[in-house]
Amino acid sequence: MESQRPSLIQLYEHLHATPELSFHEKKTSARMAQEIRALGFEVTEKVGGFGVVAVLKNGPGKTVLVRTDLDGLPVREIGSVPYVSQTTTKDDAGNDVSVMHACGHDMHMTCWVGAARALAASKDKWKGTLVFIAQPAEERGMGALAMIDDGLYKRFPKPDVCLALHCDAGLAVGTFGVTSGPATASTDTVDILVHGVGGHGAMPNTTKDPIVLASQIVLALQTIDSRELHPVEPVVITVGKFNGGTKHNIIPDKVELGLTVRTTSAETREKVLESIKRICRGLGIAAGLPNH
């Protein structure tokens, strides 16, 4: 693999400089397909959007799936490396945004290509079937399901083992972290639309202020983890988006909240999502907005 280092570094720098948003990974997907097709894999593109599935059969044996993600994030990169991302685009709402590989997917793709090269070059040392998949829209928590719904496990060999990784800045270079049980959390994206009755900021008594209600919801959500779940159960509820209002002196008629929810068990996930619904309903009733 040492001989592959220069070309893999070059690939990494290219991917880092040219990120694409979730479900828009057209060029990234094509590059992954190009890289792995050159190794003799049978490649299918546009699985579940811009997903890629590559199969390499090497006699009888187990089927192993190796997965990478593709998408970047709407984040502006501040850096001075020669391959800094200067990519800008429009998001799904039509807003102009910068794009960056801020979560390591450029590194994941490079590792994926490197692993494919190593395995394709050492077919005399293993038997079985490889299924290499490149998954779109990981950041939105929707790409894996899109590929499954598009027949991932029906159109292609079903794996006995699935392998994936996530880079971790907390680990020293050359160190691998492994654990029994969940290593990373599942993610849910939750959108909450808080309705109110807008009006003049100097006469709040004539309104139902959705900013106040939304603020109460944000604070109440933090009690789910601290007061409803077992103290050692790992849960994260983060409000990453709070949008509402257009002017200083106008109370708006709605506020949009955007959450990311991270859990490590199906049972806890259901509890958390139900608690979010209950809190929103209850605070809406308390604010005199039972249907909002």
Annotate the PLM regions.
Residues 1-101, 106, 110-127:
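Acidic/His- and Gly-rich active-site-bordering loop/insert found
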Residues 248-274, 291:
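A conserved active-site cap/scaffold subdomain adjacent to cofactor or substrate pockets
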Residues 39-42, 228-236, 284-291:
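Short secondary-structure junctions
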Residues 70-72, 224-225, 277-288:
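A common structural junction motif
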Residues 47-51, 234, 252-254:
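Short Gly/Ser/Thr- and Asp/Glu-enriched loop/turn motifs at secondary-structure junctions
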Residues 15, 147, 259:
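Residue-level signal for inorganic ion chemistry
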Residues 73-75, 81-100, 106-107, 119-252:
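Histidine/acidic-residue-rich, glycine-tolerant segments that coordinate divalent metal ions
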